[in-house]
């Protein structure tokens, strides 16, 4: 049928109006709100049907079988490093393998651990416990009574959710304590005051949780009392994120600290003195790390001018507790940031502080000790330019463990004795051959001119011909840094098969301190997407890859990031893996823990929506745009980021006639599968998709 120019114009206007109405309807009336009922029959049936179609297609990808088999081998390997945790004179470890799918909690002596063959003693078998009790238990950790190291509160989750059941356990008798402390399923927090007393925050009943779903009331709970008989010592507001009490047990004293967090990176702390709470007069975004040698250790997230002195953001400060309570503000500066050098992490031993920094995103390690009231600092040598992860430190002596790795060097565990040098005690297997691979650090220029660093890992035989399958991973939120580390998954499934891997250090993370983070929050959050887009464009300009061969991947906040990137620039990418993502930013604060992140993104129920609506992925999907065939995956039991975010994105894309892939695991919390085999399968699906789209 032939149309005249006038008729064509009328038809074009009509089509535009229909498209606009569709987008408007998507913004105002959400036809997929029913997907927020996590375990409704309708939602689960929808998820099951599309998940089965996705897995069937991905399992037929030629690379899937080999990648999956390799991941099963890696994740179940008995040659993995058993991460140690000091408690008393012992080292504890939680371990999963094919014989212990749910896992075993075990221990050994330090001397035995440092030998080639470790003599382990099983303390609790979670597989046996789950079978006996008929529960889908997933191990979530333990809180020891630190001065005795016999009794502990064990956290067990049903299906991997953040909410846990907590039960008192006797590590000497290796059994749960009869009539011991017990907390039903909730997002509870506990801290031991003494062997017969806990501070507890939990779901005490109606109106005892914050809008974010965390405890707002802290109570002192004595042995023999029912939970309802516990004594309230502090109440926060429902609009706070959480409130709780933590006890620092130190050789010189015991310190009880009550904290309330009105926002994600803001808190007010009180020192409990007798029955009184004394407010610690600190900036609301400062973090009390702990109390050490009768000194407060304080980390600053913003510049602080007080009593004629100026202390920079990202500094670590110390001051005597008594001096501070008397009004003195003459702080000792233990760390002060420099250009592209930022604070990263801190632990303590009996007499030393151990901290790591990031120097242009690579780790350095330092030890501080007091001598005649002066802090003496020394650097602890590392094998190269990579990443340090402080594993565990002893409070009985000055020993500690740390992990070191880089992109091409498998993770090694080092042990440091009292004031000594690192000794390598365990090394992970090399799961891929790095021969011929290269790593460089480049910079992209973002929209506002800021230089954004990224690591480029090139496979053997690499040529800058714009044809390389390239995967960019980024996160960019909550002050979480992305560091150069060894990944057996990336190496074996991607690099060794000829793919290029990119780790982008975009704003929103903590790679260069708190200011790098705050440069991408709330009204500045578009910066997050601009930085990732800049990295993608830089890779194309350098002929590393082209849009046809370029994929992006992110999870949680990173899932929001990659979702926003492909809705804004669908022309740049041919593959998108969005895992356990946020996406519907109009309703995110009403779903599970979403309200706790409003300091990061904004409150959509206020004028903040005026900027949020410009980048919220769900509201910005359009029937007029051509999108890549994106892949979303999530977990039904994720009780942190609601699975409806991923569900709704997929449903909307389907409504608009777009091809999309989706997988929802019925188990697993926000972190993924509940056991190594589930994690191996889920990871293999992602790489099968990437090879399908980018080869």
Where are these regions (language model features)?
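Glycine-rich His-Gly loop
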Residues: 96, 405, 473-477, 556, ...
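Structured core elements
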Residues: 153, 191, 199, 256-257, ...
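Secondary-structure transition/capping motifs at alpha-helix termini
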Residues: 113-116, 147, 159-161, 171-175, ...
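Cap/lid segment of the alpha/beta-hydrolase catalytic domain
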Residues: 124-145, 156-161, 175, 180, ...
